[in-house]
A protein has these predicted regions:
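A short helix->loop->beta-strand "cap" motif at the edges of active sites that frequently abuts
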Residues: 130-137
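Conserved phosphate/ATP/ADP-binding segment of small-molecule kinases
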Residues: 148-197
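Single conserved hydrophobic/aromatic residue that forms the stacking wall/gate
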Residues: 1-4, 9
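Active-site glycine- and acidic-residue-rich loops that bind
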Residues: 86-88, 113-122, 145-155, 189-192
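Structural alpha-helical scaffold elements that stabilize or flank donor/cofactor-binding regions
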Residues: 1, 99-100, 160-161
Length: 197
């Protein structure tokens, strides 16, 4: 959660806010409803110095998730409520890549983005292609979430996405969940596997 904010923002927004705190120019791209809750999300980002001028407005719902904290022997549980959100229902036509990438040198996204919906998977691939066409560095934090998509679907989509990624951030769970990598292999074997893929 962002310090001093009642709204909890995760994933790419935290990356943008963290960079803005180090005086790095950041721009956040998403689609949010044009109502009070959507505006609150925009304002929350803006207050930290994040450029929100490319946020697309439309749709009715904002995607959310609930975090049930661990108690006693019950593990932490995340409940996603993102189906039907403005972001999940976004289309390729919503995003003007010339405007979005104008002056950009780096494009970062989370692996949660293409997991949100088939539309977002297609849009993520298109965004990566458009960034690469412009010579922009592309980075991805895989963030595999089995509650959002199967390993098979994640593998299919992320294998395509990663063709355009310069820097891929992952932990062993991400590598196993998305690419089926055997985390018990030696570093030499892992590196050879990654290079082959």
């Amino acid at each position: 959660c962002l310090v001093g904010s009642e709204m909890c923002i995760r994933d790419r927004a935290n990356t943008a806010v963290s960079l803005a705190n180090f005086n790095v120019d950041t721009r956040y791209v998403t689609k949010l409803p044009k109502h009070t809750i959507g505006q609150s999300a925009v304002n929350s980002l803006r207050q930290y110095g994040v450029d929100v001028s490319r946020i697309v407005r439309g749709g009715d719902q904002i995607g959310i998730y609930f975090l049930e904290k661990k108690t006693s022997q019950r593990p932490t549980n995340v409940i996603y409520n993102r189906n039907g959100s403005a972001f999940a229902l976004a289309t390729k036509e919503d995003f003007d890549w010339d405007s979005i990438f104008d002056g950009a040198t780096w494009f970062h996204f989370s692996g949660i983005t293409p997991a949100i919906s088939d539309n977002m998977a297609e849009i993520t691939i298109e965004a990566c292609k458009e960034a690469k066409k412009r010579g922009i560095t592309v980075s991805c934090d895989l963030n595999y979430r089995s509650k959002l998509w199967s390993s098979e679907k994640a593998n299919k989509v992320m294998s395509e996405v990663c063709r355009y990624v310069d820097i891929c951030i992952a932990n062993e769970d991400d590598a196993v969940g998305i690419f089926g990598m055997d985390a018990s292999k030696s570093d030499k074997e892992k590196n050879a596997y990654i290079a082959e893929e």
